[in-house]
Amino acid sequence: MDWFQALVLALIQGLTEFLPISSSAHLILPSQILGWPDQGLAFDVAVHLGTLLAVMMYYRRDLIAMVGGAGLAVQQRRMNDDLKLGLLVALATIPAVVFGFLGDDFIERELRSALVIAITTLVFGALLWASDAFGKREFSLARLGVAGAIFIGLAQALALIPGTSRSGITITAALALGYRREDAARFSFLLSIPVILGAGLLKTKDLIEQQVVVDWGMMALGVIVSAVTAYLTIVFFIRLLERVGMLPFVVYRLILGVALLFWLA
C-alpha cells in the first residue's frame, strides 16, 4: 500500500465510520473494484484508533458523566441516570461480542464480497428509511431500558455483515423504538466506543503475535487523518440530522447498491 492509498483509506474510514452507510463496505470495495492491496493489520489498528479518539472527544462530557455517575452511585447507594446510561451501553455491547466471537471466521470467509455488500446496502437502507419515516421520534434516552438496549444491541450484531453499517442499524433500531433522531444517534455513537475499542485491541493482539513490521509514518497518517475526518463527520451528521433526517443517506445507499449490482452483472 502506498501513501496515496493510505490517505484515501484513512479518509474513507473517518468519513464512513459514523455515517449510516457502512465503513467496512467502503474499505472492502477499493480492493474489490480497484484491485488495491489489503490495508494490513497495522493500518487497520491506526484508523480504528483515530475514529475512537474522535468519538471519545465529541462525547467526552457523556463519558465523564458516566464515570462520575458510577462514583456518585457508590456514594449515594442508588442508581442515577448517568450510570444507567453507561450500564445500558455495556449491556447493548454484549450481543456484538458474542456473535463476533462465534461468527467472525464465517463472515470473513463467506460474506466479504461485493454482492453481499450490494444486498445489505439496499435492504438495510430500506429499513433505515422506514424507521425514520414511520418511527414516532418522541422519546429521549432517559426512557431507554434493558429491553430496548438489548434490542439495539442485537441489531448492532447484524453490523458484523459487511454493508450493514453499525451506526445505520443501531440508529434504525432506536428510531423503530420511537426515539428522537438525535437521541438515536447519541446512543449509537456511544455504543461504538466499546466496539471500536474491542476491535482495535483484538487487531493489536494479532499485530503483536504476527510480529508485523510497522511503518510508523503511515500509522501516524492513518490516526491523524481518520481522527480529524471522523470528528468533523460527527459534527456534520448531528447538525444535519434534525433538519433533513436519514433520506440523503438512504438515497446514497440506494445508488451504491444498484451501482454495485450493475457492476456485478
UniProtKB/Swiss-Prot annotation:
It catalyses: di-trans,octa-cis-undecaprenyl diphosphate + H2O = di-trans,octa-cis-undecaprenyl phosphate + phosphate + H(+). Keywords: Antibiotic resistance, Cell inner membrane, Cell membrane, Cell shape, Cell wall biogenesis/degradation, Hydrolase, Membrane, Peptidoglycan synthesis, Transmembrane, Transmembrane helix. GO terms for molecular function: undecaprenyl-diphosphatase activity. It is found in: Cell inner membrane. InterPro entries: UppP. Its main location: membrane. Coiled coil: none annotated. NCBIfam families: PRK00281.2-4, undec_PP_bacA. Catalyzes the dephosphorylation of undecaprenyl diphosphate (UPP). Confers resistance to bacitracin. Bacitracin is thought to be involved in the inhibition of peptidoglycan synthesis by sequestering undecaprenyl diphosphate, thereby reducing the pool of lipid carrier available. This is Undecaprenyl-diphosphatase. It comes from Alcanivorax borkumensis (strain ATCC 700651 / DSM 11573 / NCIMB 13689 / SK2). The lineage of its organism: Bacteria, Pseudomonadati, Pseudomonadota, Gammaproteobacteria, Oceanospirillales. The gene is uppP.
